[in-house]
Amino acid sequence: MLPSVPTQVPIFRRPLLALGFFLCAKLILAKAGGSFLLPAVTTGVPGKAAFWLLIPGVFLLLVITVTDFEQRLIFDDTTLPLAVFGLVHSIALSCAAASYAPLLKNLFAAVAGGLIFLTLAYLTRGGVGGGDVKLIAALGLWLGPERLTAVVCVGFFIGGLAALLLLLTGQKKRKDAFAYGPCFTLPAILALLTGIF
């Protein structure tokens, strides 16, 4: 069963939705030949396909950010399409480069990242959830090993800092659940759109 959708958008969700529209607008404007944040669209059908696939990818990452904030859950309804779009994106990149290297690297990142987080989920006994495992595997298909490693490191740093602040301010206790998903999705969006990592 799909999660219920609230009839009114919570006040803190509105900036995230506005950010999503802004990022998609930047993607569209970049097609004209590049912008402050984004490079120009690669020529050729595969390159253009890889570019336009960023739009559903970013949208799904924003949805995951919101749902994990709200419900402490990352749904298969979003991670599965994210993985599918990521696989198609990897194939398009390989076609544009006339090489299997991008696809193979991204597949390796997905498998390795998923296995590492699956191990963490077992060792932490629920500290890392199944949704986080699937999210990292899906991100591997988009980012490849180098950028996925950077995003995970940044995510752990941001998450650890945020958790520490919540503990120090008394808003969270040590055994309380903490939404780590946004700590990975937001750096991933930056990586996809700016090449910052």
Placement of each model-derived feature along the sequence:
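A membrane-topology feature that recognizes alpha-helical transmembrane segments
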Residues: M1-F197
